[in-house]
């Protein structure tokens, strides 16, 4: 369905980073095995187009498998022969945007591990991904690498931020909600520049194709993690993969930030709404409580937000029949935008009408003396 938001996942640009592929295969199997068992998985798959390239560099990966069948092969580049009889091009220095910008972020030396090749897109592997991106309309791309537990955003070729830095960071904050990866540009996370990389081209080239919000997660603690660490990596990247898929379309998140005690007659519940999704759509919120005969809640008019925008929404409630002292009230809020939805429950307490109340914003009801610094006027 061409109307469905499209997402690209890639792994193994570098041959010695198998955990990047392992977590992707784990995610793919999870979707397949749970499609008919988990309503959320089914809704995601039915409303998104997900494209997976688990091994961008098959020749390099096969070489490591041949030389080190038990693991720990450290060949990085592909296996192409260069004109100077050296071997291998770093595929993640071979993309066309700011290719060869300088010799700091990539190398002109064929023996170097960051050798960028004779020209931009000289390699069949990067040309294949270029054609894939031109053919499709990816809103988000996630190009997995190892290692370091970080999430890299453009730009890589220099130290400047993109004009969409706020949008990149709101997406990255959602991606890393649970794994808490460190987020930033290559310089801020790795302490060095990179040029000719996938993220810069996917985001920066808007002539050959659309703009893609492209990210590079560097997963795990090592190039060849232990068996136990592999399982941890697979779990830590699950939410990131789901978040990338959802955020390619319409997504808005909801939080509730009101006092625990509800007013005796009427009051407002404060909701904080943040749009993280790329596609614009109506945001619809419904509210209910477990005392519908005693508390009436006003309807909330649908609205829209810009990407990365946050808004506080006040939800008015009316207590039409008093509740018992200290009775618990559970409010349920449901947010829907496009196919994405969230439900949160907020627990409040009803205390009734107080005997006396002071907002403490002035001292009109108070007096002081030497022996009694502050006392209530009778």
Report residues per predicted region.
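Short acidic, flexible loop segments centered on an aromatic residue
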Residues: 274-294, 334-335
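Extracellular Ig-like/FN3 beta-sandwich strand-entry sites
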Residues: 266, 280, 310, 324-330
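Terminal connector regions
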Residues: 318-353
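Intrinsically disordered, low-complexity Pro/Gly/Ser/Thr-rich segments with frequent PxxP/GP/PP motifs
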Residues: 294-324
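Short beta-strand elements of extracellular/lumenal beta-sandwich folds
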Residues: 263-279
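Metallocarboxypeptidase
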Residues: 67-266
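Extracellular glycan-recognition surfaces and repeat-rich motifs
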Residues: 355-378
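Active-site-adjacent structural elements in enzyme catalytic domains
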Residues: 1-79, 129
């Amino acid at each position: 369905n061409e109307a469905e938001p499209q997402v690209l996942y890639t792994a193994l640009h570098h041959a010695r980073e198998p955990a990047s592929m392992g977590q992707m295969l784990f995610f793919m199997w999870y979707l397949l095995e749970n499609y008919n068992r988990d309503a959320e998985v089914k809704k995601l798959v039915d409303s998104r187009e997900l494209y997976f390239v688990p091994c961008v560099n098959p020749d390099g990966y096969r070489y490591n498998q041949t030389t080190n069948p038990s693991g720990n092969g450290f060949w990085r580049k592909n296996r192409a022969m260069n004109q100077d009889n050296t071997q291998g091009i770093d595929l993640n220095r071979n993309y066309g945007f700011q290719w060869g910008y300088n010799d700091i972020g990539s190398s002109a030396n064929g023996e170097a591990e960051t050798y960028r090749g004779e020209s931009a897109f000289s390699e069949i592997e990067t040309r294949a991904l270029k054609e894939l991106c031109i053919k499709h309309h990816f809103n988000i791309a996630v190009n997995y690498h190892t290692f370091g537990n970080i999430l890299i955003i453009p730009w890589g070729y220099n130290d400047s931020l993109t004009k969409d830095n706020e949008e990149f960071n709101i997406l990255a904050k959602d991606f890393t909600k649970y794994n808490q990866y460190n987020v930033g540009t290559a310089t801020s996370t790795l302490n060095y520049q990179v040029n000719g990389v996938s993220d810069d081209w996917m985001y920066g080239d808007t002539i050959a194709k659309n703009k893609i919000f492209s990210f590079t997660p560097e997963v795990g603690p090592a190039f060849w993690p232990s068996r136990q660490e592999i399982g941890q990596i697979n779990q830590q990247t699950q939410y990131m993969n789901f978040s990338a898929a959802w955020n390619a379309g319409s997504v808005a998140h909801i939080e509730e930030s009101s006092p625990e005690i509800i007013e005796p007659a009427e009051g407002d519940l404060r909701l904080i709404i943040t749009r993280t999704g790329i596609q614009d759509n109506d945001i619809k919120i419904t509210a209910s409580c477990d005392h519908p005969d005693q508390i009436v809640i006003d309807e909330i008019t649908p609205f829209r937000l810009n990407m990365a925008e946050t808004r506080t929404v006040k939800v008015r409630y009316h207590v039409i029949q008093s509740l018992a002292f200290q009775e618990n009230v559970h409010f349920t809020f449901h947010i829907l935008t496009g196919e994405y939805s969230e439900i949160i429950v907020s627990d409040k307490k009803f205390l009734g009408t107080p005997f006396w109340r002071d907002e403490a914003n002035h001292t009109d009801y108070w007096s002081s003396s030497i022996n009694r610094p502050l006392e209530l006027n009778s």
